[in-house]
Amino acid sequence: MASFLNQFTRQPKIFGTLPSQGITYNQEVIQDMNVTSVPIFGMNTMDELILKTPDALFSGEATALVVKSCIPSILDPWKILTADMDYLLIGVRIATYGDRLPITTTCPKCKADTKSDLHLPSLLDNYTSQEPVEKITFNGLDLDIVPLTYEISTKISKDNYQMQRTLLHIDQQKDLSEEQKDLQKQTIYKSLSMLNFETVLHHVYSISDGQNVETDKEEIFAFVKNSEIGLYKLIEDATNIISKKFALPKVDVACSSETCNHVYKSETSFDYSNFFEVRS
């Protein structure tokens, strides 16, 4: 006999519409390809504990586990585009703690700190109002440029972090000459340049000539690498447009200092290590 407690288990608090419209997904990524009414649950105790594990946060595993717990229709969080991931995590925050996120900003005029609330549903609206694909044309080819997947974004962040750490380690080596340090750092700089190059190319979802469509990453990478530099520049410009479209908007803040009252715009950003903390 089922326990009466089952009727008190978590229920969806909100239903979301994915900004990407599921353009790159299949049924292995999201159940039934439902991208317009995605049920989002609040976090449970285990979710909160996972988000307090530094190694799991750094690897991206904590976020992936929380998404699978709070949004069970997402079957493979690693394949979710970053624009959708940010949207979903904001949704989880709303479902868990409510519509508002307390923030503290610094007045650029008097340097006083001001506490205010960020209205999270308006951020969700901002995400869904954006076109998820940038289309470019080059020599008769049509390219679809989309946000990175969470998997690729996480890998790039980890690789970049490790390379920056290596550069710092080289500088701290007292047994190396300046020439030896420069040689080692040049190797890292080349790797960073290649990482930046590949980051741009990972935004290319497909290339079409009107009759055929190529989505294989290896084929796309090889083609762009062997094409005129103009193609790469077009892709890079399109990725910058996407980044700006899905960046968190600046918020208007009135300085709390009675002698100032300056109204300023403040940038917002989310650090997922503390985004889900309860703040008063």
Please place each PLM-identified region on the residue numbering.
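Long C-terminal interaction/binding lobes of large macromolecular proteins
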Residues: 1-280
